[in-house]
């Protein structure tokens, strides 16, 4: 159970970081 929770937590963190970087790059391009 703990392993699954940790896996989903890591996946969510990776997705959040990727989205943040993608949005950041788009803002830089707009500027």
Swiss-Prot record:
It holds the Pfam family PetL. One of its GO terms (cellular component) is cytochrome b6f complex. Its main location: plastid. The chain crosses the membrane at residues 4-24. GO terms for biological process: photosynthesis. SUPFAM superfamilies: PetL subunit of the cytochrome b6f complex. One of its GO terms (molecular function) is electron transporter, transferring electrons within cytochrome b6/f complex of photosystem II activity. Keywords: Chloroplast, Electron transport, Membrane, Photosynthesis, Plastid, Thylakoid, Transmembrane, Transmembrane helix, Transport. It is found in: Plastid, Chloroplast thylakoid membrane. It is a single-pass membrane protein. The 4 large subunits of the cytochrome b6-f complex are cytochrome b6, subunit IV (17 kDa polypeptide, PetD), cytochrome f and the Rieske protein, while the 4 small subunits are PetG, PetL, PetM and PetN. The complex functions as a dimer. Component of the cytochrome b6-f complex, which mediates electron transfer between photosystem II (PSII) and photosystem I (PSI), cyclic electron flow around PSI, and state transitions. PetL is important for photoautotrophic growth as well as for electron transfer efficiency and stability of the cytochrome b6-f complex. Belongs to the PetL family. PANTHER family: CYTOCHROME B6-F COMPLEX SUBUNIT 6. This is Cytochrome b6-f complex subunit 6. It comes from Coffea arabica (Arabian coffee). The gene is petL.
